[in-house]
Every structure is written in structure tokens, then in C-alpha cells.
Amino acid sequence: MSLCGYADRGVKQPAKPPTSNDVDGLVPGPPARHGGVPLSSQRPTLADVAAAAKVSVSTASLAFSGAGPIAATTRQRVHDAASELGYAGPNPLGRQLRRGRSGIVGVVVGDALSRAFRDPVTTQVLDGLVGHLGTLDLGVLLIPSASGPTTTTIDPLLESAAMDVAVVMWGGAGDSPVLAGLARRGIPTVLIEGRLAPGVSVVGIDDRGGIEQVTRHLLDLGHTRIASVTLPFDHERRDGLMTTQRLADPAWEITRRRLAGIHDAGVTPAAVYETPASLVEHGATAGRVLLSGPDRPTAIVCQSDLLASGVVLAARELGLRVPQDVSIAGFDGIDLPWLAPDVLTTVVQPLTEKGATVGRLVEDILAGAEPEHRELPVTLRVGTTTGPAPA
């Protein structure tokens, strides 16, 4: 399994495409010998291994691939010869060229990499995805999304990088330029938590139902003034209280669904604060604004655990008791050791399994399967940060 970082455009590329000699490592020169078998001067090749094992090159190739009706003794003889010659296996580039595939899955992380990797949600989903792709001998190319206010800019890698399948994390808007760019190239795509689109596989969770469940939990505790701290509405990534006009149509699907979950419980939020990213400091900023006024809410539903933990820290900073003065709930189910002794009330999603599910869809696509939609369940975990509404 190889995990390729964001490509370094300062690295010079080969002036010409690889030839069969480049791929197989056949470099002219005085041959060395192994038991009477001529060897390449720089490194052993599959042909050298086949000669040493006294089998055909095709048989040696099948011995490494694990395919075909090859006797166990023959396979072992090939591997023994390879070990003695120091041959590590067929060149991956050559194998990719023969298959007509790059062996690479492009993963668009949905944000600047420096910000995305501060969120355990991203890393846990990637763990599940990369873990499954590793069993398929596929590499991963990480591609950041445009992080500025424009919705028309996409990373040049999306237009040029070799990839067999693309995975788009945190799908964004239905008219995403990322999806449009991948469609132009004809690259099969798996979308994580985005709007259903023709020809695109989608892996989602019942986040709308999960938010409805945690909101009803707060209603059962007697809360009536319930506010919301949200993920970004769109590429503008604003930071502040929402106007009625902006609330009307969030472009990003995750934000839209989780807001809808509050309404499904019969609640119109007392206030909605949009944050530019799922980070603790943005939750703390939102918490200070929402909890400083005279008509502060008695409960706050946050669209991520990192945002919720920031609100908890802001409440403590303002001298408010959680949950006696204000109840706070999140979404994700990640570890938040800095909140101890409190345990956040949250909606738990199966992060690693979500990534593995995406990996299985990638596998299915490479096998010729049609696009499909899979939705994973979520569960409410009641912690110590929610309690009865203050009198």
C-alpha cells in the first residue's frame, strides 16, 4: 500500500514515457551469472528468476501474481530463486501499464490538507479507506479542495493526475466543480456524504436522523431555546450568526441535512452560528457569541464533536456550568480527552467502517459494478454534557 502525499510540482517528470525496457529493467551491459544463468548488470529481472528456477517467464509471473494452476512446488521454486537473486517482484509500473490502470485512487479531502488533518473525522475515515485499498495493492493520491471563496477553482491534479477511481470526501454542493471535472475525464467517483448524482456512488450516514434524535433528547429534558453551531454552508466558509436569507439554502449537503434534522424534531433554532471549519477554536468562538447575551439558549446542538468541545470550553470560560446552565451536544463520536471529566453527549457515526465501505465500493467499481448508494446507521450516546433545562 502506498500513500502518496500532495504531489510536488517541483519534481521533474521523465522526458519520455517509459518503454518496455525501462519497465522491465533490462539495461545493456556485461551480464553477471547465477549458476550459469546470465543476469542483468543492475538488478535481476523476472526473466532471470525464471531461468534460475527453470520455468518459463509466464509461469514465473503467475507464481508472483498468485493466479493460475501452478503447483505449489513450482511456485516455491520461483520464490526461492527470486530470494537468492534479490528480486523483490514484478515492477509495479510495468504491471500497471499491462493492465491499463494506474493503480492509484485519487482522494479529494474537501479542504486544505493542513486543516483537514486536524480533524480526527478525516483521519479515521482515511484509515478505513486506506486500510481496505491496501489489501487491493492500490495507492492513494491526496488532493486538496480549493479553500477560498470561489466555487470554480479546482486543483490542477484533478485535471491531469492518473487515477483509476476518485473518492470525494464531504461531497459539498451538487454542482461541485470537482465532480464536474472528474465527469469530464470519465473517472468513476465515490462521494462521501454528498447529494445523489447520476453515475456517482455515494456512501452516507443517517446524520439527519441522528440530529433529530439528539434534538428530541433535549426536548425531553425540557429545553425550548435550542441553538445550532454548524459546519460551513459553502466555499465562502463564513464565521458568524446566520441571516434568514443564508439559512434558506445551505449549499453543502452535510450542513443542510444536519440542520434539517433539528427541524424534523419540530424545533426552529433560536440562533444558528456558521463556522468556517470543524475545529475546536471555531466552536469556542461560536460559544462565546451564543452564550454571552441575555437571551442565551439553554441547549446547543453542534454539527461536530470538535465544535461542541469548543462550545463547552467557552461555557466554562464564561463561568457557566455544563449541563446545569447549558446543555451541549455534538456529532461524530470521537475521543475528546481534554473535556474530562465530562463526556460529550453526541451522535456516534462509524468512521473507520465508513472509510472501509468506500474502499469496498472502489473495489466493486474496478470489478465493473454499477454505481450505488450505501447509508450507514448512527447511534445516540448520552454523556454528561446534557441535562434538564434550567428553571
Predicted segments, located by residue:
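Bacterial carbohydrate/catabolite-sensing allosteric modules
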Residues: 1-39, 84, 131-135, 183-391
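N-terminal helix-turn-helix DNA-binding module of bacterial transcription factors
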Residues: 1-101, 390-391
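Short beta-strand segments enriched in small/hydrophobic residues
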Residues: 59-61, 97-114, 225-231, 243-248
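Amphipathic helical "hinge" segments at domain boundaries
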Residues: 80, 88-155, 165, 260
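Short beta->alpha connector loops
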Residues: 111, 146-149, 169-175, 195, ...
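Short, well-structured alpha-helical segments in soluble
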Residues: 151-162, 284-294
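Short, Asp-centered acidic motifs that coordinate Mg2+ and/or phosphate
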Residues: 164-167, 299
